[in-house]
């Protein structure tokens, strides 16, 4: 990891790239190298809310729930959702307030974003679902 950061760290920072890893040792190494490089801890499932120094988390969408999101809101960390490859996953990610989505189907996500922006009823529906979901 040290060699990788020596070789690519400045470029990663210069171009605003981010790093993501399933290995928390990588998160620690990147933060020790330069705490301004965004680094996300990939979580394949949701069991216990992690307490880490990571910039945020990348959570598998089917295990993401309101408990995790509510805990996340008490931190300054961000949330990416993977793998958003269908409208159900997209709606869930939007409803839960994800900061970003990882997908194998970029055209589908772009289409869903366009539809949400262009259709006030769709946006209203998502907002209504979110309000019900969080019981406001």
Feature annotation, model-predicted:
Residues 1-38, 59, 75, 130-136:
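Metal-dependent phosphodiesterase/phospholipase catalytic core, i.e.
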Residues 33, 37-136:
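C-terminal active-site rim and adjoining tail of enzyme catalytic domains
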């Amino acid at each position: 990891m040290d060699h990788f950061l020596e070789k690519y760290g400045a470029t990663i920072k210069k171009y605003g790239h981010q790093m993501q890893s399933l290995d928390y040792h990588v998160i620690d190494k990147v933060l020790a190298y330069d705490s301004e490089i965004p680094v996300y801890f990939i979580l394949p499932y949701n069991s216990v809310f992690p307490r880490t120094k990571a910039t945020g988390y990348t959570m598998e969408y089917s295990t993401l729930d309101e408990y995790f999101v509510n805990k996340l809101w008490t931190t300054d960390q961000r949330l990416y959702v993977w793998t958003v490859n269908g409208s159900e996953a997209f709606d869930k990610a939007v409803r839960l307030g994800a900061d970003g989505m990882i997908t194998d189907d970029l055209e589908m996500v772009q289409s869903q974003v366009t539809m949400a922006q262009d259709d006030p009823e769709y946006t209203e529906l998502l907002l209504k679902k979110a309000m019900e979901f969080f019981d406001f």
